[in-house]
Amino acid sequence: MGKKFMFALGVVLATAQAFGAVYYVAPDGNDSNAGSEKKPFATLNKANKVVSAGDTVWIRGGIYDLHDTVFYERYKMTAGILLTASGESDDNRIYYLAYPGERPIFDATNLPVAAGEEHSDGTPEGAMYTSPIVVAAKYLHLKGFEVRNTPMIHNSNSGIFIYASKHIFLEQIDSHHNAGPGFFAHDGASGGGGHLFLNCDAHDNYDPTDWQGDGENADGFGVHYQYDGDTTKFIGCRAWWNSDDGYDVLAQEFPVVVENSYAMGNGYIHYGTSKPPNGNGNGFKMGYSRNDKGRHIIKNCVAWNNVATGFYSNYTTIGSTWINNTSYKNGDRSFGMPSTIYAEDERTRIAEVVPLMDDKAHVLKNNIAFPNKLSQIGTCWEKISSQDIDHYVDCPAGENNTWNFDLDLTEDDFVSLDDPSMTVTGEDLSTIPGMLGPRNADGSLPDVDFLKLKKGSRAIDKGEDVGLPFAGKAPDLGAFEYGMPASSSVAKSCSSAGKSSSSARKSSSSSKKPSAIVKKPAAIAGVQGPADVFDMQGRYLGTLPAETLRGDIAEALHAQFQVAGIYLVRHGKTTQQVTVK
């Protein structure tokens, strides 16, 4: 690991640290090159062949036209990019990172797609599925790029497909306008999973010619078919205008956690202007599980304007935990909790609809259903027909929710009910400031007033202490606690997908002196707004206040992070490397 690769960031030169090799990929590169800054590779497929644990691949900005595929033998599918090289642990990953300040876009418009329909014949020509990016590895960190325009013939094709993998960290990735799910994880019984989706977006995905139905399978995020391993988490993610569901964990037999995430307008297509005939349109579809192991956790999430239900359990055999969520103006129900029972073969339904009781019951606490108060809560029952009166039974619908209090909230309980997502159609919402607009520089969710509680709101201090931070004498109802900043979606640590760095990595004591002269970082005069700070792997560490940038930046970094090492400080379009001793 002692190799040195010269690279530039902003206006300064530095050397890679001794803990891993550094490679570059660029749209104008060549796979015959060395993969250096000046002679980058052209494809991630080439990078995948040379990397090992601890290595970093910087992906330069621009459009990558994916027009060739490789065959993934294990799943009998084709891929534009196939990542199979693995890291060794959460602290020794392989990193595929967007070059700071640049935006790589993987465009699959010209990607040849598989023509198989219901079955694969085991050949590339007869494969059923194609994805621009297929991950079949362990301990990777992917960050900062877009995947778009995946085509299809008979089967929906995911923007990013993760198969039999472990601890994949996906950060600030936008997967959109694909003919299938934005993201799809399929981990089976391999002891895998444990992925972290941090600040990712999935929107405007639609599968019009799916053999199962028009719009049937294009979810924003899908996690399916896992039976053991580690828990996958979503933090700070958004799903909107996907033809099927926003988040779908159908047949996921292992827990999933979703927090501080949004689902809007799912079940609509073409920027919200129409509905496909076969899309479901749920915001958070957290089921089904057939073996009683898939108890999921959904907290501090918001679902609005979805065609069907905001928060939906989808005929599961085990309840989930729904804490401090807000459901607003969803078409069918705010919270729909239908449940059932399967035989031991986990295939045959013994009963269509049953209440889940005792340790199998759903846990619903501190949730807001607005404006549809009780009539559309849809707790744990459904009437199959006029003859099925035994199924027409109410079951417990949680505690300390708006419907438990018979709390009929109004517009006066909220700071604002206005957002572009409530009024704008036919346009790309990701470009318009609002709940679904541009993210903060660190990738976290935009801080807007939509659905926040107003001073004096009847939902303030009405909740139960469930272990989440709160400001008043008791927790509030809904996703946003009055008197506290919006929940950060910048993860400081995650047991399921490894630790985000809390300080810059130290240079190895065995590394040689750099052969390039590094200029002393200059103070930034007249600066407005904070600067973002990253480690040498491109991982976000925090911010430096504007006033500290006018003086000794190294001293400010030492005071802020208190660890010697090399930092990247980015303000606007300028990135400086700063060494703290």
PLM region spans:
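Acidic Gly/Asp/Thr-rich repetitive segments characteristic of extracellular carbohydrate-active
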Residues: 27-66, 80-84, 457, 476-479, ...
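Short glycine/acidic-rich loop motifs that flank beta-strands on beta-rich extracellular proteins
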Residues: 68-69, 108-111, 116-118, 130-131, ...
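Extracellular beta-strand-rich solenoid/capping regions of secreted or surface-exposed proteins
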Residues: 45, 49-53, 66-95, 105-143, ...
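Predominantly extracellular beta-rich ligand-binding scaffolds that present long acidic/polar faces
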Residues: 67, 76-79, 260, 294-447
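Right-handed parallel beta-helix
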Residues: 60, 93, 97-103, 138-149, ...
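Short, surface-exposed loop/turn motifs with a glycine/proline- and acidic-biased composition
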Residues: 536-575
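Terminal processing/anchoring signals of secreted or surface-associated proteins
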Residues: 488, 494, 517, 533, ...
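Surface beta-loop-beta hairpin patches that serve as ligand-binding interfaces in beta-rich domains
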Residues: 424, 432-487, 491
